[in-house]
Amino acid sequence: MMRNNNLKRREPLTDTQLLLTITICIFFAMYGLAMLVWGGGFLRFQQVFDMLNNNAALIIVACGLTIVMIGGGIDISVGGVTALVVMSCIVHMNNGGSIFTAALLAIGIGLCFGLVHGFLISYLEIQPFIITLAGMFFARGMTTIVSLEPQKIAHEGFQQLMKTKIEIPWLGYIAKKGNLIPARMEIGVVVALVVLVVVFIMLKKTRLGRGFYAIGGNSQSALMLGVNVKRTRFFSYLISGLLSGIAGFVFMMHTGAGNATNAAGAEMNAIASAIIGGTLLSGGVGNVIGTFFGVLTLTTIKAIVTTSGLREPWWQSITTGAMLCFFILLQSVVLSRRAKKKAKAKDLLKE
């Protein structure tokens, strides 16, 4: 009896943890199904690394957007800012600029957009959708002004950086000729993973991170608890802009070229990844680890569609839209049932 009393009661999962668990389970279920049905590349670790290599910039953008969405906002300028950074940095380096100054330029452009968006939304209280939509159009227009023609990086040092790969032999595979092909990961993936860890720690351990959840859950309650709502919201957009700038630099490291349509649809893919990862559009609930698995889930869906023989781009859009609706409905049902159980438990305690 004493032993039972001493046992700690297991605390129920929070909404964020519950949705994260669901996302991870669905990702592994989908990837496992792909391995069983199609085999081939899905059986190799390189498939996962390719997913990361191709989506490192999206992971970074989605991390910034997750912060904004947790705070109850939205930022649809991220794709345009990423494209502007890519084109600006390529033109800068092709005209004698260094890699270091290009990196500073990328960060500076991202911070400028984040600063303007954050100020207008937080302190002038203009609707986030309107401001970031204007920011998206402005960034896309500026991208065209920077260069009407597609650009390719001619900087030798940056070309060498692009070719640099991190090889992991023990995760490789044996080719038909019997030689070992190591798994290869680009530098951009390392940057994306570092950003992911830093943002995760910030949201989990810092006062600012907890403030994002507070203002997203209920801004009035957060204000009464002493949270500076305007400043916290301002920082959410500032960080989103910063990460969009970093994402542009990583995108450039992956493609080595730029044009006016770079990162087209990145904002929609980032929003979809965040929602699939368990971030609520209403705010207050979300996690960048969930967003990371949201990106992987979205990429797996597209890979499955392509492997199935449906190579036309609209099939990927249709499937992505259907899966997004499924995840939104799933979140709604799970959280609704959870709320009813909590209400029922409170009623029983009152009795």
Predicted regions and their residues:
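Cytosolic-side transmembrane-helix boundaries in multi-pass membrane proteins
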Residues: 1-28, 32-33, 217-220, 224-231, ...
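Helix-loop-helix "hairpin" substructures at the membrane interface of multi-pass membrane proteins
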Residues: 98-103, 112-117, 121, 169-258
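Alpha-helical transmembrane segments within multi-pass membrane transporters and channels
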Residues: 97-137, 293-294
